[in-house]
Amino acid sequence: MRIDILSLFPDMFDATLGQSIVGRAQDDGFVDIKVTDFRQYTTDKHRHVDDAPFGGGAGMLLQAQPIFDAMDAIEQETKDTYPKGRVILMDPAGRRFDQDFAMELAQEEHLTFICGHYEGYDERIRQLVTDEASLGDYVLTGGELAAMVMVDATVRFVPGVLGNMSSPMGDSFSNGLLEYPQYTRPADFRGMKVPEVLTSGNHEKIREWRMRESLKRTLERRPDLLKNAKLSREQQIILQDLKLDLDPDAPK
Protein backbone atom coordinates (compact mmCIF):
# COMPACT_ATOMS: atom_id res chain seq x y z
CA MET A 1 0.00 0.00 0.00
CA ARG A 2 1.08 3.54 -0.75
CA ILE A 3 -0.04 6.33 1.59
CA ASP A 4 0.49 9.98 0.69
CA ILE A 5 -0.13 12.77 3.16
CA LEU A 6 -0.36 16.44 2.22
CA SER A 7 0.49 18.73 5.11
CA LEU A 8 1.99 22.11 5.94
CA PHE A 9 3.77 20.51 8.89
CA PRO A 10 5.42 17.31 7.65
CA ASP A 11 7.78 17.09 10.62
CA MET A 12 4.81 16.33 12.86
CA PHE A 13 4.60 12.85 11.36
CA ASP A 14 8.18 11.77 12.03
CA ALA A 15 7.68 10.71 15.65
CA THR A 16 4.45 8.80 15.08
CA LEU A 17 4.61 7.13 11.68
CA GLY A 18 8.19 5.98 12.14
CA GLN A 19 7.50 4.07 15.34
CA SER A 20 5.87 0.84 16.49
CA ILE A 21 3.58 -1.07 14.12
CA VAL A 22 3.42 1.62 11.43
CA GLY A 23 7.20 1.99 11.45
CA ARG A 24 7.72 -1.76 11.17
CA ALA A 25 5.13 -1.97 8.40
CA GLN A 26 7.25 0.45 6.39
CA ASP A 27 10.51 -1.32 7.22
CA ASP A 28 9.00 -4.65 6.14
CA GLY A 29 7.70 -3.24 2.87
CA PHE A 30 3.98 -3.57 3.54
CA VAL A 31 3.37 0.17 3.43
CA ASP A 32 5.11 3.08 1.73
CA ILE A 33 4.28 6.41 3.40
CA LYS A 34 5.29 9.77 1.97
CA VAL A 35 4.49 13.14 3.55
CA THR A 36 4.49 16.12 1.20
CA ASP A 37 4.71 19.76 2.27
CA PHE A 38 2.32 21.33 -0.21
CA ARG A 39 3.78 24.76 0.50
CA GLN A 40 6.50 23.65 -1.92
CA TYR A 41 3.94 23.95 -4.71
CA THR A 42 3.04 27.60 -4.19
CA THR A 43 3.73 29.97 -7.07
CA ASP A 44 4.14 33.35 -5.36
CA LYS A 45 7.43 34.55 -3.90
CA HIS A 46 6.05 34.65 -0.35
CA ARG A 47 4.87 31.03 -0.59
CA HIS A 48 1.35 31.82 0.55
CA VAL A 49 -1.01 28.86 0.79
CA ASP A 50 -4.04 30.75 2.13
CA ASP A 51 -6.11 33.81 1.33
CA ALA A 52 -9.20 35.66 2.52
CA PRO A 53 -12.60 34.27 1.43
CA PHE A 54 -14.56 35.98 -1.32
CA GLY A 55 -17.55 37.79 0.14
CA GLY A 56 -15.77 38.43 3.41
CA GLY A 57 -15.79 36.49 6.64
CA ALA A 58 -13.48 35.48 9.45
CA GLY A 59 -10.33 33.47 8.95
CA MET A 60 -8.33 32.37 5.95
CA LEU A 61 -8.91 29.56 3.47
CA LEU A 62 -6.43 27.13 1.95
CA GLN A 63 -6.01 27.93 -1.71
CA ALA A 64 -6.80 25.35 -4.35
CA GLN A 65 -3.65 25.81 -6.45
CA PRO A 66 -0.99 24.33 -4.10
CA ILE A 67 -3.18 21.33 -3.31
CA PHE A 68 -4.02 20.66 -6.96
CA ASP A 69 -0.39 20.93 -8.02
CA ALA A 70 0.77 18.66 -5.20
CA MET A 71 -1.85 16.09 -6.19
CA ASP A 72 -0.72 16.32 -9.83
CA ALA A 73 2.85 15.60 -8.73
CA ILE A 74 1.77 12.59 -6.68
CA GLU A 75 -0.20 11.23 -9.61
CA GLN A 76 2.79 11.58 -11.92
CA GLU A 77 5.06 9.85 -9.41
CA THR A 78 2.74 6.92 -8.72
CA LYS A 79 0.81 6.41 -11.96
CA ASP A 80 2.95 3.47 -13.10
CA THR A 81 2.97 1.66 -9.75
CA TYR A 82 -0.27 2.48 -7.92
CA PRO A 83 -3.84 3.35 -8.90
CA LYS A 84 -5.07 6.80 -7.93
CA GLY A 85 -7.03 5.29 -5.06
CA ARG A 86 -9.03 7.21 -2.50
CA VAL A 87 -8.34 10.78 -1.45
CA ILE A 88 -9.45 11.61 2.08
CA LEU A 89 -9.95 15.21 3.15
CA MET A 90 -9.65 15.91 6.88
CA ASP A 91 -12.81 17.85 7.73
CA PRO A 92 -14.86 18.12 10.96
CA ALA A 93 -18.00 17.87 8.81
CA GLY A 94 -16.88 14.60 7.22
CA ARG A 95 -17.83 10.99 7.82
CA ARG A 96 -17.05 9.86 11.35
CA PHE A 97 -13.95 7.69 11.31
CA ASP A 98 -14.40 4.30 12.95
CA GLN A 99 -13.10 0.75 12.82
CA ASP A 100 -15.26 -0.14 9.81
CA PHE A 101 -13.88 2.86 7.93
CA ALA A 102 -10.32 1.78 8.79
CA MET A 103 -10.96 -1.76 7.54
CA GLU A 104 -12.48 -0.33 4.38
CA LEU A 105 -9.47 1.88 3.66
CA ALA A 106 -7.07 -0.99 4.32
CA GLN A 107 -8.41 -2.74 1.22
CA GLU A 108 -7.10 0.05 -1.02
CA GLU A 109 -3.72 0.09 -2.76
CA HIS A 110 -3.27 3.85 -2.57
CA LEU A 111 -4.57 6.41 -0.08
CA THR A 112 -3.99 10.15 0.04
CA PHE A 113 -4.81 12.23 3.12
CA ILE A 114 -5.16 16.00 2.80
CA CYS A 115 -4.58 17.88 6.05
CA GLY A 116 -6.17 21.29 6.29
CA HIS A 117 -5.30 24.30 8.38
CA TYR A 118 -6.68 27.77 8.95
CA GLU A 119 -10.44 28.39 8.71
CA GLY A 120 -11.13 25.89 5.96
CA TYR A 121 -10.69 24.98 2.30
CA ASP A 122 -11.41 26.61 -1.01
CA GLU A 123 -14.47 24.58 -2.01
CA ARG A 124 -12.84 23.57 -5.31
CA ILE A 125 -10.39 21.36 -3.42
CA ARG A 126 -13.28 18.99 -2.74
CA GLN A 127 -13.31 18.15 -6.45
CA LEU A 128 -10.15 16.13 -5.82
CA VAL A 129 -11.44 13.99 -2.96
CA THR A 130 -13.39 10.76 -2.71
CA ASP A 131 -14.00 10.95 1.05
CA GLU A 132 -14.22 13.55 3.79
CA ALA A 133 -13.40 12.23 7.25
CA SER A 134 -13.56 13.42 10.85
CA LEU A 135 -12.49 12.01 14.21
CA GLY A 136 -15.47 13.54 15.97
CA ASP A 137 -17.62 16.56 16.61
CA TYR A 138 -14.82 18.95 17.51
CA VAL A 139 -12.31 21.11 15.68
CA LEU A 140 -8.53 20.62 15.77
CA THR A 141 -5.93 23.21 14.82
CA GLY A 142 -5.09 21.19 11.73
CA GLY A 143 -5.78 17.85 10.11
CA GLU A 144 -2.42 16.32 10.99
CA LEU A 145 -3.46 14.66 14.25
CA ALA A 146 -6.57 13.21 12.63
CA ALA A 147 -4.53 11.85 9.72
CA MET A 148 -2.07 10.20 12.11
CA VAL A 149 -4.89 8.42 13.89
CA MET A 150 -6.50 7.28 10.65
CA VAL A 151 -3.24 6.03 9.16
CA ASP A 152 -2.37 4.11 12.32
CA ALA A 153 -5.81 2.49 12.55
CA THR A 154 -5.80 1.62 8.83
CA VAL A 155 -2.28 0.17 8.63
CA ARG A 156 -3.15 -2.38 11.33
CA PHE A 157 -5.54 -4.01 8.87
CA VAL A 158 -3.19 -4.12 5.88
CA PRO A 159 -2.59 -7.83 5.19
CA GLY A 160 0.72 -8.99 6.64
CA VAL A 161 1.29 -6.05 8.98
CA LEU A 162 0.03 -7.96 11.99
CA GLY A 163 1.04 -11.57 11.53
CA ASN A 164 -2.03 -12.91 13.35
CA MET A 165 -5.10 -11.37 11.71
CA SER A 166 -7.23 -12.55 14.62
CA SER A 167 -5.48 -9.86 16.66
CA PRO A 168 -6.90 -6.77 14.88
CA MET A 169 -10.18 -8.56 14.24
CA GLY A 170 -10.52 -9.10 17.99
CA ASP A 171 -10.03 -5.43 18.80
CA SER A 172 -12.86 -3.42 20.25
CA PHE A 173 -15.36 -2.37 17.56
CA SER A 174 -14.12 -4.88 14.94
CA ASN A 175 -17.17 -7.06 15.57
CA GLY A 176 -19.38 -4.18 16.67
CA LEU A 177 -18.73 -4.83 20.37
CA LEU A 178 -16.19 -3.77 22.96
CA GLU A 179 -13.36 -6.17 23.65
CA TYR A 180 -13.53 -8.57 26.59
CA PRO A 181 -11.16 -8.13 29.60
CA GLN A 182 -7.71 -9.67 29.22
CA TYR A 183 -5.05 -10.73 31.72
CA THR A 184 -1.44 -11.90 31.75
CA ARG A 185 0.96 -13.28 34.38
CA PRO A 186 0.96 -13.39 37.35
CA ALA A 187 -2.40 -15.04 37.97
CA ASP A 188 -2.61 -13.41 41.40
CA PHE A 189 -1.31 -9.86 41.77
CA ARG A 190 -1.82 -8.09 45.10
CA GLY A 191 -4.88 -10.16 45.74
CA MET A 192 -6.39 -9.45 42.33
CA LYS A 193 -6.89 -12.84 40.73
CA VAL A 194 -7.41 -13.79 37.12
CA PRO A 195 -10.84 -15.40 36.55
CA GLU A 196 -10.42 -19.15 37.03
CA VAL A 197 -12.00 -19.98 33.70
CA LEU A 198 -9.07 -18.39 31.86
CA THR A 199 -6.59 -20.76 33.50
CA SER A 200 -8.81 -23.83 33.23
CA GLY A 201 -7.64 -24.92 29.79
CA ASN A 202 -11.27 -25.41 28.74
CA HIS A 203 -11.36 -23.55 25.43
CA GLU A 204 -15.12 -23.72 25.03
CA LYS A 205 -15.69 -22.23 28.49
CA ILE A 206 -13.11 -19.53 27.73
CA ARG A 207 -14.88 -18.69 24.47
CA GLU A 208 -18.23 -18.42 26.27
CA TRP A 209 -16.73 -16.27 29.03
CA ARG A 210 -15.14 -13.89 26.54
CA MET A 211 -18.37 -13.58 24.59
CA ARG A 212 -20.36 -12.83 27.74
CA GLU A 213 -17.83 -10.31 29.05
CA SER A 214 -17.66 -8.55 25.69
CA LEU A 215 -21.43 -8.19 25.64
CA LYS A 216 -21.51 -7.12 29.29
CA ARG A 217 -18.87 -4.44 28.80
CA THR A 218 -20.64 -3.14 25.71
CA LEU A 219 -24.00 -3.06 27.49
CA GLU A 220 -22.53 -1.18 30.45
CA ARG A 221 -20.27 1.26 28.62
CA ARG A 222 -21.52 1.64 25.05
CA PRO A 223 -25.11 0.37 24.80
CA ASP A 224 -25.53 2.44 21.64
CA LEU A 225 -23.30 -0.04 19.79
CA LEU A 226 -25.79 -2.84 20.37
CA LYS A 227 -28.38 -1.15 18.16
CA ASN A 228 -26.43 -2.00 15.01
CA ALA A 229 -24.45 -5.03 16.19
CA LYS A 230 -25.10 -8.23 14.25
CA LEU A 231 -25.52 -10.72 17.07
CA SER A 232 -25.74 -14.47 16.78
CA ARG A 233 -28.60 -16.32 18.44
CA GLU A 234 -26.22 -17.32 21.23
CA GLN A 235 -25.20 -13.71 21.78
CA GLN A 236 -28.81 -12.56 21.81
CA ILE A 237 -29.65 -15.04 24.58
CA ILE A 238 -26.63 -13.97 26.63
CA LEU A 239 -27.49 -10.31 26.15
CA GLN A 240 -31.05 -10.87 27.36
CA ASP A 241 -29.70 -12.58 30.49
CA LEU A 242 -27.33 -9.68 31.10
CA LYS A 243 -30.14 -7.16 30.79
CA LEU A 244 -32.17 -9.10 33.36
CA ASP A 245 -29.17 -9.15 35.70
CA LEU A 246 -28.91 -5.37 35.45
CA ASP A 247 -32.66 -4.79 35.63
CA PRO A 248 -34.76 -7.73 36.89
CA ASP A 249 -37.94 -5.81 36.03
CA ALA A 250 -36.99 -5.41 32.36
CA PRO A 251 -39.39 -7.06 29.88
CA LYS A 252 -38.33 -10.56 28.83
Curated annotation (Swiss-Prot):
Main subcellular localisation: cytoplasm
Superkingdom, taxonomy of origin: Bacteria
GO biological process, one term: tRNA N1-guanine methylation
Binding-site list for S-adenosyl-L-methionine: G116, L135, G136, D137, Y138, V139, L140
GO cellular component, one term: cytosol
E.C. numbers: 2.1.1.228
Keywords from the named record: Cytoplasm, Methyltransferase, S-adenosyl-L-methionine, Transferase, tRNA processing
UniProt catalytic activity: guanosine(37) in tRNA + S-adenosyl-L-methionine = N(1)-methylguanosine(37) in tRNA + S-adenosyl-L-homocysteine + H(+)
Electron transport found in the keyword field: no
Function text: Specifically methylates guanosine-37 in various tRNAs.
PANTHER family in the record: TRNA (GUANINE-N(1)-)-METHYLTRANSFERASE
Recorded family membership: Belongs to the RNA methyltransferase TrmD family.
Protein name (database record): tRNA (guanine-N(1)-)-methyltransferase
Organism: Limosilactobacillus fermentum (strain NBRC 3956 / LMG 18251) (Lactobacillus fermentum)
